[in-house]
Structure formats: structure tokens, C-alpha cells
Amino acid sequence: MTATSGTSSSTPTGYLVPTKKVRIADLKARKGTGEPFAMLTAYDYSTAVAFAEAGVEIMLVGDSAANVVFGYDATQRISMDEMVYLTAAVVRGAGNAAVVADLPFGTYEASDEQAVKAASEMLHRTGAHAVKIEGGVRIADRIRAITDAGISVCAHIGFTPQSVNQLGGFKVQGRGAGAEQLLADARAVQEAGADMVVLEMVPADVAASVTKELDIPTIGIGAGPDCDGQVLVWHDMAAFPAGGHRPRFAKQWASVGSDLTAAAAAYKREVAEGGFPTQEHCF
């Protein structure tokens, strides 16, 4: 939020933070204002606190936790219980930020009833403000059922990690003839009642066209600068762990991995050499 919006204030650290609860409707109202918003993933209380203090307005508890938290080889492996534990922790630390939670693979695809039950469980057990589900035309009926139940939905089209095997790997979506399908997916999720939509690994010009076409906000991840918001996995933007693979679309603003490793090594060395603890650390 801008300093002139009347809904943010400067903290002692100089960051602009929301002074009231950010609602999904608030972010929808930013559509077309030229004021993009930043979303980051978060998976625990302490990280959520840090991002709230930085003024991040919306956090995503993504099923990317399967990879970066639990060490699974695919997002399809994470369970509802695992997502619930992480999301509840993030909500407790998120301050005024809105929190969106991924519905895990296999919890919403089979039927409208299954989708509504999963979305309701996620919000009831965690306090999250919206759920995110992957897919366009093929999943529009599930989005409609969830929104008809009074639950906000963030859709996710383009590259959808839960469908990585069907898509043939980590590939850019929406090139050539695929642009028409992407636009059809975008229209379908909007018509089904989605409040916003993530565009992942989509050519920038295609994402710009989709953003212009839709009345709901688009959130880009590897989708160029013209989306209404941007999202990154925080491990990618902060280089954690050190030496890990970083997608081309992610910029690094810190080196958390190398700093943490260096701190752990220094601690180990001082303990081994008798340099810690000293008198100042004793009662």
C-alpha cells in the first residue's frame, strides 16, 4: 500500500505496513489502479511475522512446502494435515496480511462436494482467508461450488505444479496456440467466481493480455511485469538454502542460506574452542 492510501503507516524500521486487516476485496479493488501488490509464500509463524513487519499484504501457504519444508520430490506428496499445520502457524504470525492456502493435490478434483469440504476444512482449521486451487476450464465447476459456499478462491493457471507430469515437466505455458487456451482458462475461472488468479511461467505479452482482459487481479510468477501482483517462493527470493536451484524468473534480494550456514559454522567453532558461552551469557 502507498503512504497516501490512508491504510498504511511507517514502522520504526521504515517499512510501510497495513494499519488494518487486508481483505481479499481490498486487493481486488486495486485492479487497474497501477498499484501492484506483493505476495510471498510463508510456511511458519516466525517467517510470517517477518513478512508482516516488512508490510507484505498477502501471504501464500503454498504446496511448494512439499519441496522446501518437507523435502518431498513433488508438490503432490503433501497432505491436508501438513498444509493445515503450516497455514495455522502462518495465520498466527501474519498480522494484518491476508493469507491464502493451497488445497493439496487430491483434495478437490473428484467432485464439487469434495472441493467444498476441503476448502471449508482449510478455513475452519486454520483461519485462512482464501484457498488456492490449480486448473482452468477443467476445474471451473469446483471453483464455482467453493465460491457458492461463501469461500474466496485464488485460481492458478499456466504452469500448474500439481500437473507437472501431465504437462511433461517444468515448461512455459501459453506459447503459440496455447495462448488461446490460457485466455479460455482465465475467463473460465473468473466466470466461476475466482477472486484472483495466479499466472505461472507464462510469456510476458500473453500475461499482459490476460491481465487486460480480466476484471479480477492477476498475480504473476514468471509472467512478466504487467500483472496486478507478483508472487515468489521466499526461498527463491532470499537464496535459501545456499547453492539451491533458482528459477530464472526469481531475483535474490538476500543470501539467507549462506548467512545462516556461516552463523552455524561460527557457533560450532566457538563452542569447540571454548569461546562460547562467556561470562556475559551466564546467570
UniProtKB/Swiss-Prot annotation:
Signal peptide range: none
Recorded metabolic or biological pathway in which this protein acts: Cofactor biosynthesis; (R)-pantothenate biosynthesis; (R)-pantoate from 3-methyl-2-oxobutanoate: step 1/2
Substrates-to-products reaction catalysed: 3-methyl-2-oxobutanoate + (6R)-5,10-methylene-5,6,7,8-tetrahydrofolate + H2O = 2-dehydropantoate + (6S)-5,6,7,8-tetrahydrofolate
GO cellular component: cytoplasm
Cofactor: Mg(2+)
Top-level EC class as recorded in UniProt: transferase
Cofactor note: Binds 1 Mg(2+) ion per subunit.
Residues noted as binding 3-methyl-2-oxobutanoate in the record, renumbered to the chain: D63, S64, D102, K132
Protein role: Catalyzes the reversible reaction in which hydroxymethyl group from 5,10-methylenetetrahydrofolate is transferred onto alpha-ketoisovalerate to form ketopantoate.
Protein's recorded name: 3-methyl-2-oxobutanoate hydroxymethyltransferase
UniProt source species: Corynebacterium jeikeium (strain K411)
